[in-house]
Amino acid sequence: MSDLFAKLMDQIEMPLDMRRSSAFSSADIIEVKVHSVSRLWEFHFAFAAVLPIATYRELHDRLIRTFEAADIKVTFDIQAAQVDYSDDLLQAYYQEAFEHAPCNSASFKSSFSKLKVTYEDDKLIIAAPRFVNNDHFRNNHLPNLVKQFEAFGFGTLTIDMVSDQEMTEHLTKDFVSSRQALVKKAVQDNLEAQKSLEAMMPPVEEATPAPKFDYKERAAKRQAGFEKATITPMIEIETEENRIVFEGMVFDVERKTTRTGRHIINFKMTDYTSSFALQKWAKDDEELRKFDMIAKGAWLRVQGNIETNPFTKSLTMNVQQVKEIVHHDRKDLMPEGQKRVELHAHTNMSTMDALPTVESLIDTAAKWGHKAVAITDHANVQSFPHGYHRARKAGIKAIFGLEANIVEDKVPISYDPVDMDLHEATYVVFDVETTGLSAMNNDLIQIAASKMFKGNIVEQFDEFIDPGHPLSAFTTELTGITDKHLQGAKPLVTVLKAFQDFCKDSILVAHNASFDVGFMNANYERHNLPKITQPVIDTLEFARNLYPEYKRHGLGPLTKRFQVSLDHHHMANYDAEATGRLLFIFLRDAREKHGIKNLLQLNTDLVAEDSYKKARIKHATIYVQNQVGLKNMFKLVSLSNIKYFEGVPRIPRTVLDAHREGLLLGTACSDGEVFDAVLTKGIDAAVDLAKYYDFIEIMPPAIYQPLVVRELIKDQAGIEQVIRDLIEVGKRAKKPVLATGNVHYLEPEEEIYREIIVRSLGQGAMINRTIGRGEGAQPAPLPKAHFRTTNEMLDEFAFLGKDLAYQVVVQNTQDFADRIEEVEVVKGDLYTPYIDKAEETVAELTYQKAFEIYGNPLPDIIDLRIEKELTSILGNGFAVIYLASQMLVNRSNERGYLVGSRGSVGSSFVATMIGITEVNPMPPHYVCPSCQHSEFITDGSVGSGYDLPNKPCPKCGTPYQKDGQDIPFETFLGFDGDKVPDIDLNFSGDDQPSAHLDVRDIFGDEYAFRAGTVGTVAEKTAYGFVKGYERDYGKFYRDAEVDRLAAGAAGVKRTTGQHPGGIVVIPNYMDVYDFTPVQYPADDVTASWQTTHFNFHDIDENVLKLDILGHDDPTMIRKLQDLSGIDPITIPADDPGVMALFSGTEILGVTPEQIGTPTGMLGIPEFGTNFVRGMVNETHPTTFAELLQLSGLSHGTDVWLGNAQDLIKEGIATLKTVIGCRDDIMVYLMHAGLEPKMAFTIMERVRKGLWLKISEEERNGYIDAMRENNVPDWYIESCGKIKYMFPKAHAAAYVLMALRVAYFKVHHPIMYYCAYFSIRAKAFELKTMSGGLDAVKARMEDITIKRKNNEATNVENDLFTTLEIVNEMLERGFKFGKLDLYKSDAIEFQIKGDTLIPPFIALEGLGENVAKQIVKARQEGEFLSKMELRKRGGASSTLVEKMDEMGILGNMPEDNQLSLFDDFF
């Protein structure tokens, strides 16, 4: 018994007879872990054998009681040298396990504790009845039971459960007997109770009124019971149980109303042991309001019965009682002015690595009273804009930084080179084997070397070294060296001196020499021996530069490639000899290929300019000190992503040096070079490196814990020593030492979310590399990386002493924060590019077009509108935005394409006049194209100018033109006209790339960038990660817990991208780094466009963003124009035939039954979906204005369903009068008599879904104003239901395009179908489409049946849409031809009379490139055989076979070799 253990036994007053027993003879305390914050002590004991059960219980009880008196919690485990597997001892400990958490859960204990155990075939066997859920046991309880037996001293047991038939029968018989007895007893008790009740009852005649039952008293008692009830951890519930009480946080709520008017609240709660689904019913609205506390984020106590939900098949609590409880968040307990500053924190913008939003990080720091907090995401600054805004709001300083990947520009092949002929040199090629990767914490166990001259080994050195302790299994497995190899080995210092003598006058050579040389120098330094000064060649870097085409340059792959023997890789003597053989191959190739003859040439002539791509990455934290530093930071991020990206963004050291002004550098985490030097090279080397930085980072010991598992550091004491060494490095280098937390999530319980995210990366990620080998190998655990308070951080560093801990945790971090100046990350103004005379040009173009249409002088209504808009546009610097858009549209028009507008730009009459949009926002009006006479209808009686009746000009008799959609300008630039315009344009998909290049041409390559986006983990993706984690790590979560974990893991950055049409334009008097860094989308360095590093929304109020989107409508219009020669601009918007499509099918010459729909909407943009077709069937629109209403209703949220649809059905309103588009609200209210400002404000509140979110006082003010002006109540109620509304200008642009397409469907049908299939159809099945009506209808019926059963694939759903159009075309008398090898186009459908000939790409599996190749090949000559079609046409065997089956190839032979018989004919 050790002295320390004996002292402990004295303190707990362990009985002497037990202390003197053989079990305690060699007892010792291996380690005691003290957690000062939680007041938890963990004892780790060593005993000669597993303790008798009575002794164990005595030790356990006395330890607990003794330390409880000091308010200290105790846990302990035992390592036993010998294990007794006798049945009695195992049975006793098995039952003891159920007295310890988490095995002591009620359900587990009651179901399993009485089972019998035995030890057979090296397994602990549990005999159980067959109705026990074996899978549930394995997933939920087996891991806990294994851990508990390990803590008892049995080591890692294999535990299995088997079904016992005898026990099953016995328990079944007992259950039946018990149930019968209970029923019998219940009946008897009931009879006796009835008799007693009758005996107690007074005579009837003397009966008095029964006392009233006191429901209030009963409710009070029930409530009191609820308040005092025992809280059950959710993890313990495994079966249906009654009157269970949970406490936890609500993370999901859904409220539903049944058809009977009852309400159900489905919600999910977690107590962080697990999660649970719950239900609460409310009979009416009044009762529902009592449960408003059931809200996301609320902490509740609930009581109810656990039952299996019949729909979800999972356990659900039916809640009976619920109350809100106070949850005590962690607090920073240090006084004001004595709180730390966190300087190393990651947000969810650290790709697949961290969880908190920058807002939550800053809010937490502010809540704790910290004066500042730093943001240091991995290699990016995408959280800066949000962090900037949030910090200003929270009143806290944000320190903007990042954790960078620093690399050396050129990694040398040779260290300390001298002028020496490589051919005449003597080389000592050496290798070392060690017990780990840390020169400071691990030991040398072998040094071996081959002295070589001109390719021959002239002398060898091979010595083992005894480290003074047994080798770990990992070391033996890796190196092949066992303890037997080390028996009788020489002392380390003797071997070191001998090796130094062996190396004299030679060039040292090693593979990955930085490791071997570093290890040797650290050991030389430790024994006061001179360090290596002679030249060194690193064959790893030699190979990388000499053979850059090879993917792998490790010793194993290189020896295989060059056929060099390597029989025992990782034993130093074999590795050294193999490396020597490779060296002389490299020297020969370097001489022959590159003329390398001298040692000095290796670094100057052979090291590649891009050797940084293979250089080892070192982490460093970089912080913005001032505004100059911010711009330099943006430049560094850009260069690392654009010029130096290789796997990850890299910053070469010289690039960092060139941009270091205004920046401060920290040494970062264990992946930083200073920390690495302390581990692998020694303090002296670390001091030299530390001088480059502005401060030294140290982190809580828990952050470094994975290094212990990876055997880089021995134990907790080793971690603490490394931290002391880092402090010593700072002292010697005269650099402050700062304690940082390496934050990756905020709360300790969020650790599991990061675990799930990180493990989803798979074993290819460095962080997931396994420890050891084999099936059971697991990655190192992730560190405890939550956001720590000041007091928690001081506890972590308590081992340094109070004063030093305070200095590194508080004082130094505050001092650093004080060095940081306030910077402007996001600018406060809009900076538009400069185009010479933009203002004059916009005004000139506007008036020029207005005079052309409306005459000069202009009508007052036109003149005033132009003046109003130009005042806003020119006065706020928006002219350049208008002019740039006009230039882009004009260029596309010149290439023969129409450009459609999106959004609210059609609300601007200036935009209409200069050609940005076709939508005219003026009130409905007539205008004469000859004399410019005009008439305006301003009373709101007409919804659209296109609906005005045709009539001639009263002045000259020319037919009037009709226009005007009555849209206020305010809906585009705001009521005051100062909102930054967002001009979205729909270019043809074919012309979109050219339009993008136009932006570069207009503004310059260095000023035009694609708008960047950030892609995060979606909740569905996170769900998959959780299920994968369950599978890979043997977990089992109930459904609610999976949902919680998925929600927690969602939102983390996964990738970057680009807006499909957004282009950001930087003003040409500034540069992009004034606003944002730049990068390639999704790290694709081959991309033709660079993107903004920031999400474009973060800077959209600072720079011009042009939305140049690709759309099918302009492409289809161009196709129809090419086919027909009709200018789409001349197509009338009020064509009667087109309008007839919305009321029936007669205009198409078919019946509804033939085409399966009552109207002609199939294939018409905006109106062809099932949803909108249903709306058309219900509303029967007859005017353009009503079509606008339909467009608005179909695109809005809660505008049609449950709102306008009901109003129309009930006859309260009509399609014309319901609220359809956002702009209609303002126009309608102004016509009703409301002031424009109030009408505008009401519109804004409604369209954004804010009507019910604004204060009751504000809302009532609007309601009163509307009622005073006779706005009906149904209209007001409709406003309250709306969540989102579509802009009328957007609807007008879309409807106008749709009507043009519909015009061709009515009047030029074969051209319409040709264009539709060429451009809009997504899926084809040529065999069906060419098979006639019966084949088409049969296939549609087949897909319909699949849809009903939810079995249809996405391709089949797309195919159904195509077949609807094919069916309609065939029913109208047109034909669908077969693919023709010599007539079909590569990608376009062809018209041959009344028949459509499909293109090659319509054949499933045949892509555009092959289609074009076939067309090109047939132009060169006829295909004589299938083999020739494959060879010249590039078609695969499968495609050729498919063509043959469809009869496309006719009698084409397999090959064009003449048979013997052909000569006779």
UniProtKB/Swiss-Prot annotation:
| The keyword Magnesium appears for this protein | no
The reply to whether DNA-binding figures as a keyword in the UniProt entry is no
Q: What is its EC number?
A: 2.7.7.7
* Entry GO CC: cytoplasm
One Pfam entry for this protein is: DNA_pol3_finger
GO terms of biological process kind: DNA-templated DNA replication
List keywords of the entry alphabetically.
Answer: Cytoplasm, DNA replication, DNA-directed DNA polymerase, Exonuclease, Hydrolase, Nuclease, Nucleotidyltransferase, Transferase
**Entry coiled-coil feature ranges:** none
Residues of the Exonuclease domain: 427-583
Q: Which PANTHER family match?
A: DNA POLYMERASE III POLC-TYPE, DNA POLYMERASE III SUBUNIT ALPHA
Family membership, please give it: Belongs to the DNA polymerase type-C family. PolC subfamily.
**Per its record, how is this protein called by name?**
DNA polymerase III PolC-type
